[in-house]
UniProtKB/Swiss-Prot annotation:
Protein name from the UniProt record: Prolactin-2
Record keywords, A-Z: Disulfide bond, Hormone, Secreted
Native source organism of the sequence: Alligator mississippiensis (American alligator)
Superkingdom of origin: Eukaryota
Family (UniProt): Belongs to the somatotropin/prolactin family.
Length: 199
């Protein structure tokens, strides 16, 4: 849904509505990320021992994120908003390459391809929505430009199939993890900023 109908003048969507849309979108992205990871796991990762190798290998690890709800509640809302922006920006590049590289996986099902494209598009939409929210909550501030650079493209193009599939597995595992974090942070922010923490 477009935030404002085209051609509309002085269209003002409430902050509450912007948050509603962002939370729905982040929930949808997390749902798709989980589905895509599970599908990939079932189809390509069985018996390869990937899960034991995949601990703490996410490119967003350099962004300090709260581990649980209690920790997140200790963080000022401006810092939490900037953190959400940082994580979303950190995924722009990997998602773009994921869409291209996943097509080269042997017998990759259409459902995985479709989800990769959909997540990439929806992540961009969520980032735009979050920039609007930050502009509304912190006028004149589009958030700091801090994000984690991703250098994983060569590993998605390795000749060795096992190593390449592990790189995909790890990226999808991280996508599921980060989309879950964003979903939780947005719910917390919405509760704090829209409902005065009465949730």
């Amino acid at each position: 849904l477009p935030i404002c109908p085209s051609g509309s003048v002085n269209c003002q969507v409430s902050l509450g509505e912007l948050f509603d849309r962002a939370v729905k979108l982040s929930h949808y992205i997390h749902f798709l990320s989980s589905e895509m990871f599970n599908e990939f796991d079932e189809r390509y990762a069985q018996g390869r021992g990937f899960i034991t190798k995949a601990v703490n290998g996410c490119h967003t690890a350099s962004l300090t994120t709260p581990e649980d709800k209690e920790q997140a509640q200790q963080i000022h809302h401006e810092d939490l908003l900037n953190l959400v922006l940082g994580v979303l920006r950190s995924w722009n590049d990997p998602l773009l390459h994921l869409v291209t590289e996943v097509q080269r996986i042997k017998e990759a099902p259409d459902t995985i391809l479709w989800k990769a494209v959909e997540i990439e598009e929806q992540n961009k939409r969520l980032l735009e929505g979050m920039e609007k929210i930050v502009g509304r909550v912190q006028p004149g501030d589009t958030g700091n430009e801090v994000y984690s650079r991703w250098s994983g493209l060569p590993s998605l193009q390795l000749a060795d199939e096992d190593s390449r599939l592990f790189a995909f597995y790890n990226l999808l595992h991280c996508g599921r993890r980060d989309s879950h974090k964003i979903d939780n942070y947005l719910k917390l922010l919405k509760c704090r900023l829209i409902h005065d923490s009465n949730c």
